[in-house]
Amino acid sequence: TPPMSADRPKLDIATFLLSSIHDMKNSLGMMAAHLEDALAEPAENGIPSGSPARGKTAQALYEVQRVNNHLIQLLALYKIDQSFYPFDPQERPLADLAREALARAMPLATSQGIEVDFDCPEDLYGWFDHELVFGVVLQALHSALHYTRTHVLLSACAHDSGVMITVEDDGPGFPDFLLAQGNAAQCGISFETGNTGLGLYFANAVAGLHQAGNKS
């Protein structure tokens, strides 16, 4: 093996990682689409309804979407930190955002027999960056679908001169110790549960970009 030249350019690890994350994200997106297609097939042509295979396919879809969302969040956080994220707040209808997020989450909800509803006035508008807020809402929906028992509700309403988006489920909720930690929980990780706090950190960063005075 020839010796490394002193003039050889140094590897830009950040560029390498970004390129790798993009590649993984695209591959996971294709895998998620294939799994969604498999779950959408009629039972007589695809995976039998109520079979263990359907449940395992739904769980695989959840995990693929979860990892893909985390990669997208990492990319967005890096760009925000480096001040080159193309932040693009525009006035948009909240109902369209809700329907788009629900459409992405419905294959998993349907396969698990979970009822999903949304409550949002058609004339409710807000100023926000679509991709960032969509990512936060989708993350919340996926978490709700994972922990709920039977029902998830996505709602949006006018609130205090702005808008409020809420995702509710009938699961056990956050444990008391996590609620007591508040924002501090975003900074820690748990080897026991595998929780990195990335979703909460991302949501907090997105809220910070959508501030008006002391409101976000």
Language-model segment annotations:
Residues 168-194:
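Glycine-rich/acidic phosphate-handling loop/turn and adjacent ATP-lid/helix
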Residues 202-215:
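Conserved glycine-/histidine-rich ATP-lid loop and adjacent helix of the Bergerat-fold HATPase_c
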Residues 62-70:
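Short alpha-helical segment of the dimerization/phosphotransfer core of two-component systems
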Residues 82-87, 125-128:
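Conserved micro-motifs of the catalytic ATP-binding
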Residues 88-91, 115-124:
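Conserved catalytic submotifs in the C-terminal HATPase_c
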Residues 151-161:
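Short beta-strand/loop element within the Bergerat-fold HATPase_c
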Residues 30-49:
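Conserved C-terminal segment of the DHp
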